[in-house]
Amino acid sequence: MTVKINYIKKITNKFAANVVFFTNEKFSINHLKKHVTNSEFNYINDLLKSSDLKKNIFVYELNSKKKIVLISAKNNLTTSDIENLGAEFYGRINYGKNSEYFINSDTVVAKYDDFLGHFLHGLKLKSYEFKKYKSKKEDRFLSINVIGNKNKPSAQTQLKFKALEEGAFFARDLVSEPGNILHPDEYAKRLISLKKNRLKVNIYDEKKLRKLGMHSLLGVGMGSVRGSYLVTIEWNGAKNNSRPLAFVGKGVTFDTGGYSLKPARFMEDMTYDMAGSAAVVGLMKSLALRKAKINAVGVVGLVENMVSGIAQRPGDIVKSYSGKTIE
């Protein structure tokens, strides 16, 4: 689903709109009187009296064109809790082809920094879908309109969360690709695209890896017709030459186990053996998009572990980059 978040001044037609309000953990709603009609207030108040207040979210359908959503912001929430609340909200309203909701930011009662920013961030992350190879693609749209003058995320906060979301979605796209598409050759090509984000990308192919003495990494990919690679991704956002933070991720695009073959019931999942590298790649993209004031380097090894006449055998001995031999 495509989610678009807009910041507007007011609702054009409050009689035919789905409106979201925040309350405290006791679902006190007196602060809503100025936002709804008397009949709507009384109706919601009566329904709450017979509701299980242990829940976080209530959706009340006032008529065929209007819903009222109440969301409880409990005390002592962490930022992860707030993001999970946004994800839960998305799960409650994620139906139908197109929909539109108005979030009244003035009703945020929780005293948390960037509460609404984290809430919307959780919603966006939950909305991720991978339908690239679906025969029938159905486009669905969700418009989230934030109204009110209080508690709106600042422009800087919006930029931060957008960068995090793009990095997360890039990583999820990589993990979701099947092994016959995202093999090491294709993976390396896609990482070159990060250069447009002002990241420095260096790709070491098999010839360079052999020269460096990285025979341990090369050994894993010996049985594949695809190449093996080491990729470094650098972000230099600090003003000084401080030592970078380093992130290393495993990028085995498919791991059969080699001659120590994986059990058949687990084999299909071995396409996810590159998820560690995807996390590193997504992180580096996010750092670049938010122009983080740090120096960082991401390192990923990209290989495919297959069975063939030239694959590495159990008991083989190779020499690693450090000079140590490994059996």
Task: Report each predicted region and the residues it spans.
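A glycine- and small-aliphatic-rich helix-loop capping segment at beta-alpha/alpha-beta transitions
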Residues: 117-124, 221-224, 262-271, 313-320
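A glycine- and small/hydrophobic-rich beta-loop-beta segment
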Residues: 292-327
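Gly/Ser/Thr-rich helix-start
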Residues: 220-224, 250-252, 256-259, 277, ...
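Conserved protein kinase catalytic core
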Residues: 78, 261, 307
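Short amphipathic alpha-helical segment within the helicase RecA-like ATPase core
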Residues: 1-251
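Active-site pocket-shaping loop/turn-to-helix segments
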Residues: 77-82, 270, 274, 327
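Alpha-helical metal-binding/catalytic segments enriched in His/Glu/Asp
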Residues: 191, 245-247, 260-304
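Glycine/charged-rich beta-loop-alpha catalytic/anionic-binding loops adjacent to active sites
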Residues: 66-73, 169-173, 243-247, 253, ...
